[in-house]
A protein has these predicted regions:
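Surface-exposed, low-hydrophobicity beta-strand/loop segments enriched in small/polar/acidic residues
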Residues: 1-171
């Protein structure tokens, strides 16, 4: 990544709703209340997902929790009822209802407001450095507002989110 503009001193993020141990560089974030920022949770499918499947195998490193809604550019959000992290290769997210469309391997997924394709958090920046997530309290990290990102070296970010990241160029 090539940074052109960042937020000096970084940003403060809520950490209590994050389901992973690390916040990875390139994760989209958006502004919440009182100057605090929130993570727009993202993931990628580990395998092809059948249209009738309620189980999503996703890459490790996501922050989804039971109760979150997860969507894709081609699929409305569905509620996650459980998260199974037993496998060393992938996690299994069990949905209340299937997506009803086939999702190819490496499909970018994101947190939605509900049964729609509206991002739960409207992203305006990307996390500047990977950071350990504390179990309680707040998390401080750098944030890139204007940057150039090599897609092959970054986390999978859905087109729905990219449309909000107007000052981030994906090459």
């Amino acid at each position: 990544m090539h940074t052109i503009a960042d937020l000096p001193g970084g940003v403060t993020l809520h950490s209590e709703n994050l389901g992973g141990a690390y916040l990875q560089v390139g994760t989209p974030i958006g502004k919440a209340e009182k100057g605090i920022y929130q993570v727009e949770k993202i993931a990628a499918t580990y395998t092809e997902i059948r249209a009738d499947s309620k189980e999503l195998k996703v890459e490790k490193g996501h922050h989804f929790l039971a109760g979150d809604y997860i969507a894709a550019d081609i699929a409305d959000g569905q509620r996650i009822v459980s998260v199974n992290k037993q496998s060393v290769e992938y996690d299994i997210l069990t949905l209340e209802q299937p997506f009803s469309v086939m999702l190819p391997k490496q499909t970018a997924l994101f947190a939605s407001e509900g049964n729609n394709k509206q991002p739960k958090v409207v992203p305006i920046a990307l996390v500047a450095a990977s950071t350990l997530v504390p179990r309680e309290g707040e998390l401080y990290c750098g944030a890139w507002l204007i940057c150039v990102v090599k897609e092959k070296q970054n986390l999978p970010i859905a087109q729905t989110l990219r449309e909000h990241l107007k000052t981030v160029l994906f090459v």
